[in-house]
């Protein structure tokens, strides 16, 4: 849930309470003409939200505004990512954070310095790890599956990161072996959460969620599910085209959301594909097994091709909107199986 309000004269900041509980200050964002608060981790239901102005001395002022009976709905969890699986990433299926989940706030100024304790060895050996990519890499050791939510605030560029473990794509989320449980959520806060100048490589990972942010000018693919991934949920993203590549068909970068290497149980939903060259490749030539993928409620907006291009995978596509797509819609090729319904 989120709410917006006009600034009150004399207020330097605001506190926001949901059913009497104060939300994290990082969830309150100031824009040119308004403020916005994101209230994350609520289950479906009715809530009372109170916005209290705060003066320059940190004291709460008069003029609080209360909204009663704010109705919160759960995310649509249709699709193969949730098939026989509960709680992708850091959240339960009811929308609440898992009981032991960590929350880390990622901004341009904290991506290098954010830190947390990670189990990195036998007998519960722990160490404090600093930097976004370093924290993700520490999970690759396979000892720690503590759910973790990375909350992206504002614009985070390639130069802001502590490093990238994939020179081709950008941030790498990699499990120790195929289909390793990671329990990670990457989620945007506010109206302007943006990943700029890089994308994501996901490999050997299970239980990863991406939601509510934009990816712009990625290195190669915006989102590459490369090898042996499962239960991956990609939703409510704005996906712009990437940097120009060396090949003739890479004027707008390479792929946008590519799914291959025996990745399975993936849902791509409620995303806006903006003018992409190649929107989504699904499968290569050797996938076998339950490579079941769902695309639903996506908006392919002036994108050129691969909506999706499917090889050797089984895909369900429904309620997608194709607007002025230049080359072709869905491409069914080698060994593919596609069920399409209610697309426009």
For each predicted feature, which ranges?
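Beta-strand-rich modules
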Residues: 37-63
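Extracellular beta-strand-rich solenoid/capping regions of secreted or surface-exposed proteins
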Residues: 124-145, 161-185, 194-211, 216-229
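Extracellular fibronectin type III
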Residues: 54-82
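Acidic/polar low-complexity surface segments
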Residues: 155-177, 183, 239-252, 276-282
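Short beta-strand elements bearing conserved aromatic residues within extracellular beta-rich modules
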Residues: 13-16
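Conserved aromatic anchor
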Residues: 1-11
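Acidic Gly/Asp/Thr-rich repetitive segments characteristic of extracellular carbohydrate-active
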Residues: 81-102, 106-149
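Right-handed parallel beta-helix
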Residues: 182-192, 206-217, 229-245, 255-256, ...
